[in-house]
Swiss-Prot record:
Compartments, as annotated in UniProt: Virion
Keywords: DNA-binding, Virion
DNA-binding keyword on record: yes
Chief localization: virion
Free-text note on domains in this protein's UniProt record: The N-terminus projects into a DNA groove.
Assembly behavior: Heterodimer composed of major capsid protein VP4 and major capsid protein VP5.
The keyword DNA-binding belongs to this UniProt entry's keyword annotation: yes
Lineage start: Viruses, Adnaviria, Zilligvirae, Taleaviricota, Tokiviricetes
Protein name, as recorded: Major capsid protein VP5
Function statement: Self-assembles to form a helical, filamentous nucleocapsid. Together with capsid protein 1, wraps arounds the DNA and maintains it in an A-form. Capsid proteins probably maintain the DNA in A-form by non-specific desolvation and specific coordination of the DNA phosphate groups by positively charged residues. This certainly protects the viral DNA under conditions such as the extreme desiccation of its host.
Cellular component, GO annotation: helical viral capsid
Length: 199
């Protein structure tokens, strides 16, 4: 006598269940895709806004440092390397956003500074030591450390870290600052403006 096939082992039923699961998985993936795209767009907008605010704040910090005498004496030749400084400090934003530790941030920013200053100081009246002194003075104002030392060798401006460099604090019109991770996790521009991190 043939053994009766149970519904649990019925190949047709098993196949239909499998197809149903595939369809459900596809629907779930499509649904989650909406959230993934929305999160990507929101994250991109937040990062773009933070970069713009960061660059504006950086420009203000550099200008204030220059006016207060924390930079080389000759204002015109400091302006000659302003774009190079912007590139170095923007790399600080990049490495902060990668959630690196303070030591790794210092090492990576020092590498960017070495390449950028070696390329951009040629033909200016700014020495390697003066440029790094200016960078340190800005970091001292911003995060309370002077992380780099400089050595000019065979035309290259070698920048090496001497202390850890904390992640970027983002300024806000409220007068507070916050780590970039907190800023990017905010759900709206209002939260970014109002977020309270460090003083």
């Amino acid at each position: 006598m043939a053994r009766k096939r149970t519904s649990k082992n019925d190949p047709l039923r098993m196949y239909l269940n499998y197809v149903r699961k595939l369809q459900t998985m596809g629907d779930a993936y499509d649904e989650s895709a909406k959230y993934r795209i929305a999160n990507f767009e929101n994250g991109f907008k937040s990062l773009h806004m933070v970069e713009n605010e960061f660059k504006q704040y950086l420009a203000n910090v550099i200008d204030e440092a220059i006016k207060s005498g924390a930079s080389p004496q000759d204002l015109p030749y400091v302006n000659e390397i302003k774009l190079a400084l912007m590139k170095i400090f923007t790399s600080w934003l990049k490495y902060s956003n990668e959630k690196l530790g303070a030591n790794e941030i210092a090492i990576n920013v020092a590498g960017t500074a070495t390449m950028t200053l070696t390329e951009n100081l040629y033909g200016t009246r700014v020495s390697c030591e003066e440029a790094v002194s200016l960078i340190n003075s800005i970091f001292a104002v911003w995060v309370g450390v002077e992380p780099f030392e400089a050595e000019e060798r065979e035309g290259a401006c070698l920048v090496t870290p001497r202390s850890p460099l904390p992640p970027v604090p983002i300024s806000s019109p409220t007068g507070f600052s916050a780590p970039i991770q907190e800023v990017l996790q905010a759900k709206s521009p209002e939260e970014i403006i109002g977020v309270k991190g460090g003083a």
